[in-house]
Amino acid sequence: MARYAVEKSTHTGGAFSDLVFVDDRTPAASVYDVPVLQLADLEPGDFYCLAVGDGKTRSDLAARCDAAGLRPYSLLAPTFIAGPGVDIADGAVFCDHSIVTTSARIGRHFQCNIYSYVAHDCVIGDFVTFAPKVACNGNVHVEDFAYIGTGALLKQGRSDAPLRIGKGAIVGMGAVVTKDVPAGAVVIGNPARTR
């Protein structure tokens, strides 16, 4: 994700004068020819975008950045498509060819990898991660910190009974989810079952 953020940084419309990585644990002077700084080197009001796949780690880092007075920045790839009525919270990352169709709510620091989509009337929580090629059909509610693996398929819910993926749940690669997934559960297979 970090490399992707660097490669797509040229599509920010010239909004930024400097692009840096922030990592208090990395002794390297640069990564991908981009300077590496420590959090203390940044100024209140600077923007940040978290390039970390794990939602809990992203949450911890966001809390540190927010406490330092930094502002979350959403990174939208040039091929990202958002339909009408889409509400995207701060800090989201949408990679190339990702789509949110219509009337969906996207939580803080959501990461949507390449070729993933979120269909109509979905609610995606904070710090959720979609790996590449996730198919999230309409009327699905994904709670905070859930991780949806590559190629997973989330069945269409109903407006009166959305399909629910519980807080912190993990949906394995290629899983076909046809029923609600409880909070903290790990599901795999077709149809998806608790591991």
Language-model segments: residues:
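A solvent-exposed beta-alpha-beta segment
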Residues: 1-55
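Short alpha-helical
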Residues: 56-57, 87
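Conserved beta-strand-loop-alpha-helix hinge in the C-terminal portion
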Residues: 184-187, 191-195
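A structural motif detector for beta-strand N-caps
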Residues: 74, 80, 86, 90-98, ...
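Glycine/small-residue-rich loop that forms an oxyanion/phosphate-binding "nest" at active or ligand-binding sites
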Residues: 50, 58-75
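Solenoidal tandem-repeat scaffolds enriched in leucines and small polar residues
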Residues: 178-180
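Intrinsically disordered, low-complexity Ser/Thr- and acidic-rich flexible linkers and loops
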Residues: 156-164
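Short amphipathic alpha-helical segments
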Residues: 2-7, 60-64, 106, 182-183
